[in-house]
Amino acid sequence: MGMTPRRKRRGGAVQITRPTGRPRTPTTQTTKRPRWVVGGTTILTFVALLYLVELIDQLSGSRLDVNGIRPLKTDGLWGVIFAPLLHANWHHLMANTIPLLVLGFLMTLAGLSRFVWATAIIWILGGLGTWLIGNVGSSCGPTDHIGASGLIFGWLAFLLVFGLFVRKGWDIVIGLVVLFVYGGILLGAMPVLGQCGGVSWQGHLSGAVAGVVAAYLLSAPERKARALKRAGARSGHPKL
């Protein structure tokens, strides 16, 4: 016991074999899902959540809709969180569905982490903007803003300008395609005075501004790398 196995060879030489004590295990390789699969699944899940919320709202007699953004009211600040999840009716939600799917999917192509941060910035900043200016132009008193269209306008604005900030060909192409297909809806962010109810241009405008802010903030790594590259080129010494 405790002896090392040995095998004699000619000439008296001894070969010692030492057990490693570590059993060999087969190597496992995790397969990373393509970005478009992750993005598509994420957006489909989010839109499915919106339909579930609307179903609950309809079954409750539209009681959830009172949780929208009520401008300049302290309790209306809760709407900043809940408003993008609420819709006035099925028609309202279905009108937002295709833009949510298309623009949301394109947003995820920049990376899921960047998509989450951009959405959070647009969601909160756009909601706060709506809370501040939501009553501007209303001819029938205080308003209550609900719907995911502010998020749509934020994603749209983000996609339009993000490529310009990062100076990457693929992102610029996406921005141009989005401009060609959805550029016309930006008219929905134009102020309309003397309006009673209807489309929330205040939410659209606030969402679009928040989208530009998000694109600028989240393009910081690329902009910083570009600035360092320019600085390095200027400070380079000529070769002798």
UniProtKB/Swiss-Prot annotation:
InterPro entries: Peptidase_S54_rhomboid_dom (IPR022764), Rhomboid-like_sf (IPR035952). One of its GO terms (molecular function) is serine-type endopeptidase activity. GO terms for cellular component: plasma membrane. Pfam families: Rhomboid. The lineage of its organism: Bacteria, Bacillati, Actinomycetota, Actinomycetes, Mycobacteriales. This is Uncharacterized protein Mb1372. It is found in: Cell membrane. The keyword Membrane applies. Keywords: Cell membrane, Membrane, Transmembrane, Transmembrane helix. It is a multi-pass membrane protein. Residues 17-31 have a biased composition (Low complexity). PANTHER family: RHOMBOID-RELATED PROTEIN (PTHR43066). Residues 1-11 have a biased composition (Basic residues). Residues 1-32 are annotated as: Disordered.
